[in-house]
A protein has these predicted regions:
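Short beta-rich binding modules
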Residues: 1-143
């Protein structure tokens, strides 16, 4: 039996626009260590700070920490200026990740019908101005 439910489609849609592929200045809002089968990862929620049209939007993605993917976790931690003392002790403190700021390059893919956000690259927040000038002008965005 089918029923017409007015307004259902509006509530099912995400009210925020999806953050497109690109380069963004972000802050780590949340980080949580999880496991999927034999693959440990950090579930990250990043809040976009720049460019302004996307400020306040969230990016949710996984950063795997398997031996094969350790280089990417290290890249993220170094560029987001994670505590070098904890890093030298092979320690990741989820609370210490919150509030870190850096630049991230993202892309979207669909795997088995599920939309995923890939973290393709990182840079220190200090490089945002230099990166943003070229990106914003080529995309026609205003700061």
């Amino acid at each position: 039996m089918k029923h017409q439910v007015p307004g259902l489609s509006d509530s099912a849609r995400d009210s925020r626009p999806e953050v497109p592929d690109g380069v963004f200045l972000v802050r780590v809002d949340h980080a949580q260590h999880r496991w999927q089968g034999q693959k440990p990862f950090y579930l990250l929620r990043l809040s976009v700070l720049e460019p302004k049209p996307f400020a306040g939007s969230s990016i949710v993605s996984r950063l795997y920490c398997t031996p094969k993917a350790m280089w990417k976790l290290g890249w993220f931690l170094r560029d987001f200026l994670y505590d070098p003392e904890l890093l030298s002790q092979d320690e990741v403190d989820e609370r210490a990740l919150r509030g870190l700021i850096g630049v991230v390059k993202i892309s979207h893919t669909v795997v088995n019908g599920i939309s995923l956000v890939n973290l393709d690259g990182f840079a220190p927040a200090s490089q945002w101005e230099a990166l943003a000038i070229a990106i914003l002008h080529s995309a026609g965005w205003q700061r």
